[in-house]
Swiss-Prot record:
Residue stretches making up the POU-specific domain: 286-360
GO molecular function: DNA binding; DNA-binding transcription activator activity, RNA polymerase II-specific; DNA-binding transcription factor activity, RNA polymerase II-specific; RNA polymerase II cis-regulatory region sequence-specific DNA binding
Annotated Polar residues bias: 228-251
Keywords of this entry: Activator, Developmental protein, DNA-binding, Homeobox, Nucleus, Phosphoprotein, Transcription, Transcription regulation
Comp. bias (Low complexity): 1-30, 207-222, 252-270
Protein's job: DNA-binding regulatory protein implicated in early development. Involved in neuronal cell fate decision. May act as an octamer-dependent activator of transcription. Could also play an early role in specific ectodermal cells, and a subsequent role in the embryonic nervous system.
Pfam families found in the cross-reference section: Homeodomain, Pou
Gene3D superfamilies in the cross-refs: Homeodomain-like, lambda repressor-like DNA-binding domains
Region (Disordered): 1-35, 191-273
DNA-binding region in chain numbering: 391-450
Annotated source species: Drosophila melanogaster (Fruit fly)
Name of the protein in question: POU domain protein 2, isoform A
InterPro entries attached to this UniProt entry: HD (IPR001356), Homeobox_CS (IPR017970), Homeodomain-like_sf (IPR009057), Lambda_DNA-bd_dom_sf (IPR010982), POU (IPR013847), POU_dom (IPR000327), POU_domain_TF (IPR050255)
């Protein structure tokens, strides 16, 4: 046991000597350090050695001073701090472990001290009570400052480059005008700001408790009736412009331009004009006419006109001679195709309906003769040209097999003689005039396709099948094969007359 104590004391002595050597090296490196610091380090080392001697199980050494007897190990450790390195034994390690476990649950107070908080609060109060006022200059002061800057600038330019300003008065005038303009703008801006401060905009917001809740269906959105929704887009524009029976194309501006057009239209000023406008609206046929009814009438009118054998130009000419309203073929065509505005179609409908009734009654009186122009003209007018003008011949529909036979005959001879046309008409059971017109139309079509071909030669030379895209075997087919087979009617039709 004594041996262990001696070994421990020897180790402590070695540690003390090493600390002394460290302090000596620090003193040699730091020449400017004071002697008091050196003494303090030596005393600390001595105290450390004496403290460890007192904590040992052996009786206290007589070298320990009486002043240190009343101090515990913790107090001496707090006094020394981190000034020197001290050897650790088992007891110091155990105490350090206990201190660490206590510091685990300790909360650090990182808040600033109350004194600094009070100073910051005082500074904030002073800043809020006396905010920094912006520097405000009167217009006269600004004008004087601008003039001073102007004069100094001119003097500086004269000194640096006198040849740059041969006439300094002009430069002075120019700069003075610019400064005056800037001053006027600044004054106007200040006046606007003052007015905004004096007259704030009134707020029209309604409290939430009093504002009624409105659904999207109840919102004040302009709505149209069913008849207006089914109206073509050109009708609203035509109504707003008050147009007459002029032709309205599909490219007519739609409802998007209606507000602008209404603004440009002069409004009625007197009560009489308003009353007359209301009377015209009441008498217009748009209220009693529906779009579906118009569509149905246009379809029926076209069918009846074709059945009676009259062209659109005939109808327009007859309406001009009978009722005093001249209409072109384009207007009748657009009416049948529903390409007119709703208002114009409503105006045209009664006139066309009247013409159709007159034409039907005339045909019925004549005993069902469709092309009896004399009967119709004697009933409706004195001259034949006053009602229908020209008459239109029937259109002939050609079957697919017949058209194929005609195409092959055209390849063999593009310009047949009258005898060949008669033979074809007998073989195909068709009218001779129809076959002649078909060959004429086919030659015109071939000219459009191949302008270089000479189809007007007096002799009907056979054409090459390769020029028209037909196989060579098509020219060697028999008449039985050409006539054999049943085909369906197709939509191709030719006109036997003008």
């Amino acid at each position: 046991m004594m041996v262990l104590q001696q070994q421990q004391q020897q180790r402590l002595w070695d540690a003390t000597t090493t600390s002394n050597t460290n302090t000596q090296t620090q003193q040699s490196a730091n020449v400017e350090s004071t002697p008091t610091k050196v003494c303090h380090q030596e005393n600390a080392a001595t105290h450390t050695f004496m403290r460890h001697m007192s904590n040992s199980p052996t009786p206290p050494s007589p070298l320990r001073s009486l002043s240190d007897c009343g101090k515990s190990f913790e107090e001496e450790e707090l006094e020394l701090g981190e000034n020197c390195e001290m050897p650790q034994n088992l007891s110091s390690k155990r105490q350090a472990r206990e201190l660490d476990s206590e510091l685990e649950n300790e909360v650090l107070d990182l808040a600033p001290p109350p004194k600094r908080l009070a100073e910051e609060q005082e500074e904030e109060k002073v800043a809020s009570v006396n905010p920094p006022q912006p520097v405000a200059f009167a217009p006269e002061e600004m004008h004087q400052a601008l003039q001073l800057q102007l004069h100094s600038y001119i003097e500086m330019v004269r000194q640096l480059a006198p040849e740059a300003f041969p006439n300094p008065n002009l430069a002075t005038q120019f700069l003075l005008q610019n400064s005056l303009q800037a001053l006027a703008q600044f004054q106007a801006l200040q006046q606007m700001k003052q007015q905004q401060r004096e007259d704030p905009l009134p707020s029209y917001s309604t409290p939430l408790a009093k504002s009624p809740l409105r659904s999207p269906s109840l919102s004040p959105v302009p709505r149209h009736s069913k008849s207006q929704q089914r109206t073509p887009p050109n009708s609203m524009t035509a109504n707003s412009l008050g147009m007459s029976s002029a032709v309205m194309t599909p490219n007519t501006p739609s409802m998007q331009q209606q507000p602008q057009l209404q603004q440009s239209t002069p409004k009625p000023t007197s009560g009489l004009t308003v009353a007359s406008a209301m009377a015209k609206l009441e008498q217009s046929p748009e209220e009693t006419t529906d779009l579906e009814e118009l569509e149905q009438f246009a379809k029926t009118f076209k069918q009846r006109r074709i059945k009676l054998g009259f062209t659109q130009g005939d109808v327009g000419l007859a309406m001009g001679k009978l009722y005093g309203n001249d209409f072109s073929q384009t207007t009748i065509s657009r009416f049948e195709a529903l390409n007119l505005s709703f208002k114009n179609m409503c105006k045209l409908k009664p006139l066309l309906q009247k013409w159709l009734e007159d034409a039907d009654s005339t045909v019925a009186k004549s005993g069902g003769g469709v092309f009896n122009i004399n009967t119709m003209t004697s009933t409706l007018s004195s001259t034949p040209e006053s009602i229908l003008g020209r008459r239109r011949k029937k259109r002939t529909s050609i079957e697919t097999t017949v058209r194929t036979t005609l195409e092959k005959a055209f390849l063999m001879n593009c310009k047949p003689t009258s005898e060949e046309i008669s033979q074809l008409s007998e073989r195909l059971n068709m009218d001779k005039e129809v076959i002649r017109v078909w060959f004429c139309n086919r030659r015109q079509k071939e000219k459009r396709i191949n302008p270089s071909l000479d189809l007007d030669s007096p002799t009907g030379t056979p054409l090459s099948s390769h020029a028209f895209g037909y196989p060579p075997q098509a020219l060697n087919m028999s008449h039985m094969q050409m006539e054999g087979g049943s085909g369906s009617f197709c939509g191709s039709s030719i006109s036997s007359g003008e």
